[in-house]
Structures are given as C-alpha cells and as structure tokens.
Amino acid sequence: MRIEKHRTPLSKGIIWTILSVCLLFMFTTLILVIVATAGSTANYKPLTNIYIGEADIKHINVSKVIPQIGPILTILGSALTAPNSSLDDIFGAMKNIADTPALTPLLTLLSNADNTTVTIESLTELAPLAISGNPASSTRQLTEINGLLKYSDNATETLDGLSRLVSASLSSASSNSSSDSTTLVLDLLKDSDNPQNSTDALLTLNNLTMSEKAQLLPVFRLFAFSTNQTATMTALATLMNTTISSSLAQTLLTQLQNTISNGGSLNNTFSTLQPLVPQASAPAFDAVELLLNQTTSTNQTLSTLSDLLEQNLTQSSSAKKAFAALTQLMENSDNSTMVVTSVQSLAAVTNTTQSTQQLIGLDDVISSSSNTNETLSILSELQSGLSGNSSSVQYIPYLFSLLGASTDPKTTFSSLVTLTSWAQENPQTFLPILDILADAKSVQPISAEELNAMTPNILEYLKIPIYYRLSIFTLCHANLENKILDCNSPHAVQNLDFRSIIYDALVTSDFQPYLNALNISANDLYLEGKLLHREHQYVPAVRSVLALNLLAIIFSFFTMIFIILLYFNRYMFKQPLWLIALALHVCVGVATVLAAIIISVMIAIIKSGTADDKYGVVFKAGPAYTGLIWTAFALSFIATGLIIYTWWRNRRSGRYMSGSVTNRKGEIYTYGDGSAISADRFGDHNLGDDDDADFEKQVNRNEITAIDNSSSANNTDVTGSTSNRTELSHPDVTPKDSNGPVNNNAHLVA
C-alpha cells in the first residue's frame, strides 16, 4: 500500500444539487423540444405563435407569379385610382358576375390585352353595341367573323387581312363608289378553282399603272367580239409569246383588210399567204387566223389587231406580265365572260391604294384559311351585312383595334362574341362592368409602384391570406393584421411546396372564380428561379429537423432516467453510469444544435431565393421556434458541462477507484466503488504482524479524515450531516482525533 496526492472530492450534497440542476435542465429541454416540434398543432394561442418560418406575400408580384392576371390587375387597379372609386365598387361588380357565363369571356378579354390602354378604349367604344345594338344584326356579324377564325390556320394573319379588307370596303362605301370592287373580287374568287392564285393575279393587274392598264383595252375588245373566249385567249397567248416582224404584220393585215373590203374569202387569203410566212412567225399567223374565225365582227377584230400590233404590245414586258395574270384568271375560272368583265371593271378603278389593300387583305385571309370556299362565302355575307347596316359600321375600327392589341386574337374575338350575347340579355348586370372600364379609361394607367402599394388591400378584400406560417406538421394562414384565419389539420411533415401552398390558399379565397374562369392550375403559377432550383436543399430540411427533434426527445428522456439512478448511493459512484449519462447529455446537445443550425440554413436559402427571384415574397424565421430550440441547446450544453465537471472531480479524487484495508478483526473495509469482501477471502494476503495492522489502521484513519475534512469544507453543519456520517462510519475503525493536525493530501492506493 502507498500514499499519493489526493484531490478534495465532492460531497453527496453537492453531487445531488448538480444532478438536480441537470435533471431540471433535461426536463426543460424535453418540454421545449416537444413544444417546438408540435408547433401550431392546435389552433389557439400561444401555440399558433410557434412556427418554423413565415412567408409574407402582401407585396407579391402578382403579374410575375400569375402572368394571366397581370393585365386584369392593371385595368382594375387603374379603375381604383379614379375619383370616388373603391374596392367594393370594382371588385363588388366583378363578384356580381362571378357565377354567370360573363366572367370567363370578360377576364379572357382583359387577360389577353397586350396593350391595356388600347384594350380599354376599344371595349369602351364597343360597349354600346352590346347594350343598345341590334342583337340579331350585331351578333350575326360577329358570328360571321368568328366563323372566319374557325377556318383559319393563322388567326393573326386572318384578322390582319380582314381588317384591311373591311377598312377598304368601308372607305369605298363612304365615298359612294359606283363600283364595289370588293364584291367584284369576291365573285371572281368564288368562281375560281384556285382562289389563292387568282388573288395573286388580281394583285398583279392592280399594280399596273393607268397607262399600262390602257394597253389592255385592245385585248378586252377582242374578248368582247369573241365567240369562243377560250380560243381567243389561246390565240392572244400565242401572239404575246411569238416574235413577228412589223413589216410582215403590216403586209398580213393589209391583205386581210383588202380581202374583207372586196368580199373575198379569208380562208383563201390565209392559204395563199401561208407559204410566204417564215417558220418562226407561223404560230402568230395561225393565231390571227383563229381570232378572225372566232369573232362576231371581222372588221372590228381586224382593226383591234391592227391597233395591238401598231402599239407593239406583243413585245411590251408590262403587257406580257398583265396578259399572264389575265390568263391565270381565265384558266382558274369556269366563267371567262365574268372574268373579262370583272377585270375590265377593276382596271377602271382609280384608287389603286384602296384596291391594293383589299386584295392584300383577301390574300391574307385566303392563304391562312383551311377551307377557302367557306371563307369566301362568309366574306360575301359579311360584306353584304356591313354595307347594309350603317349602325354597325362605326364599331368596326374599334373591333380590329381590340384584336390588334390582343396576344390571342382568336380567343379574344370568340370571348367578345360570347360577352356581347350575354350583355344584350343582361344589360343591367353588365352596366357596372362598363363603369369600371370607363373609370379605367378616364385615368392614366396605374404604375407598378402604385399597384404594389395597393396589392395588400386587394388581397385582403379577396380574403387571400397574407402570412403563411409553416410548422413541422401544420400550416397556418394569417390576415393583414396578423390574426390567424385557419390552420390545417396536423398531417405529415410539410414539404415546403410553395406552388401548392399559394395555389391552395387562392382556391379557398374569393379569388377562386378568377382561377376557374382563366383555367389556371397550380402548374400555371410561374415560380421558376433560384427558389425552386434549390428546392432539393430546403425540402428535406424539415424532415431532418423532425428526426433530430425526435432524437433529442428520446435522448432527453433516457438522460433523465440515468440522472435519477445516480441519486442512489449504490449507483452514485459507478463510473459506467456517469459515462452513459454524459454520452446522453452530449447526444441531446448535438441533436438540438443540429436542428437549430439546419433550420437557420433553410431559412437563409429560402430568403435568398425569394429575394433573387423578385417575387415580392418575404420569408423570415419564426422567433418562438428559434428561441425554443436554441434555449434547449443552451440548457443541454450547460447540463453537459455540469456532468463533465462532476464526473471529472470524482475521478480525480479517486471516488471511482476500488480500495480496501483490514480492520482489527481481519475484516475488509472498502471505499470508492469497490464491494465489501470478507476477510477470510484474502488468506495470506491479510496483514499478519502488528506493525502492518497499525499501519493499515493509520492509513484508514487518514482516508476517513481526508473525506471528513472535505465534507466539512463543503457543508456548513458537519455534525448534522447524517449522509456523510453514514458514508464514513465503519465497525472497529476508530476516528482520528479531530483536534490534532489533519493530512488532507493523504490518499491510499491499493
């Protein structure tokens, strides 16, 4: 046996105090983590104030998140800036038609507006057509235009062409033109086997100058005297494509004229002249013979041919071009007489700009049509209706302005037809909508800053939640005043799908009719950007935090059990129990600090994403939840420190070391965490001589004295400490006189 330096051990009173503090801290940690995890599982305060994070959408960029709503909000927001306008006036009127067939076409018209100013002006001007117009007439004309779009492969091109065509027709009607060129052209195209080709031919003829058109007069006269216009066209085509010398032409015409004057036979003359004609000019010679054989007036035909050759039309490039276009018209038509008559009338039109617009418009409409015959039939009916109804004509320019300002003219027009039909049957319900349009027209379009400022009030009026409080198991909605509106039933861990969160809130609000009318689903919400790209980082965070919180709860519970065990004397100085308790304290601390860190990182990721994407959404951490988790970590950290301190002091003071001495009766006295062992088990190991026995007793007294003095140093009433006396008393061990000097540094090592 030998004596070493001995550190003053902690008394049981201090150990119990430390264990009590640790038990209290672990119990508090357990409660804090449970409350933080449960969060707003019950819809009452103060639990509703416990949430992981809160999304604030009062200044959400609606035009970016829901692009279809952007133009609508711009128009309605502009109306709100008008004098004496209020949310009830604007959105109350919209709410009145929410359950009617009018909401869908109205919102579609506004949503498709690429230029809200033009759209508002056009709708305002078209409104009387719906309210006070002739339902049968105005609706029929709109239906006819809608029919054109039905057969269109390119609605934009069709409407552009129709706009040119109708504008030109209206101009012609206002000038009282004696020749309705549009009607002539439509008749030509309806008779054509290839309307597209015929339209191109008419454009070619229309682009000729008046002098170039005059060159065609001999051609028209030849057709006028012809008994077989197909043969006449063939003969003229041959003349246009064959080179004939002027001398030969003059000789031929002179001989023919003499024959006619003398009453001779033209056939004999042609037979006589045939051998004299060069081979290259033979086709032209045969063409002249064909023309004279298929005419009602030989003299007039021969005179016309003479004029045609004298003007050298067969060599004129413009004449060749014009004749080629005329040939196309004849070939595509089953009524060559109508073709000649119509082309001759169109050639007399002096306003080529107007006629060009008509033909270009027709070309656009026909080229974009999937059914040319139906398209031409509808155009004829529309032309007839507009020319006979002056009351509808005044609305045509605004109609095409509306379509021109639309991103989807086809849908816009069909919506206008539907809305007009409904408004004519329900004028009183529709009048407040017209007031909204009038208010919007009377003021400047609302700016982005003004719209952003009034967004909170609009959202509040439509009962759309402003604040979204995310807990682990629940999601709560709050209004502009931070009052809880509702909390969903606790369910599986929140997956932080912001698209679904926002859409579900919209569906349960007064905004639902707008979503249904525009057929907007959750996938239509535009939330692309950094926030969604990092979804794989923050979505698993909530599940991780839940797992860590559960571990913290479990570890806290078992830590409390081991702390209670350490209260008992038989376990107080068992080093393995202290090490297990220490490990559990560390686990609680690690679980809570990781949960707190993960939430902080998740909040930072979401805040960064919403800021960079410029959605106007502000996300911040829940102060109550953050405080609970960090407090739980702080308590577990302090408790861990206390356990480490106590364990280390006990270890350094030898409390965990097994030691023994033999008393006068040969019995073993044990201390530390050793067990009492009978003296006879030691046999030869017992101290046999008196010197050794005296030495052992002295050592035992020193050990007892050291512990006694330690207890006296840590307790104010040494004599009253029954626990210490119980610990130190042992049979046949005589305490050392306390009046003498005490060696507090003596330590026995077996």
UniProtKB/Swiss-Prot annotation:
Residues 703-750 are annotated as: Disordered. Keywords: Glycoprotein, Isopeptide bond, Mitochondrion, Phosphoprotein, Ubl conjugation. GO terms for cellular component: cell cortex of cell tip; cell periphery; mitochondrion; plasma membrane. The modification Phosphoserine is found at S675, S678. Glycans are attached at residues 61, 84, 115, 154, 176, 197, 207, 228, 241, 267, 293, 299, 312, 335, 351, 373, 389, 519, 709, 714, 724. The keyword Phosphoprotein applies. One of its GO terms (biological process) is fungal-type cell wall organization. Residues 703-726, 736-750 have a biased composition (Polar residues). It is found in: Mitochondrion. There is a cross-link at K697 (Glycyl lysine isopeptide (Lys-Gly) (interchain with G-Cter in ubiquitin)). N-glycosylated. The keyword Ribosomal protein does not apply. This is Uncharacterized protein YKL187C. It comes from Saccharomyces cerevisiae (strain ATCC 204508 / S288c).
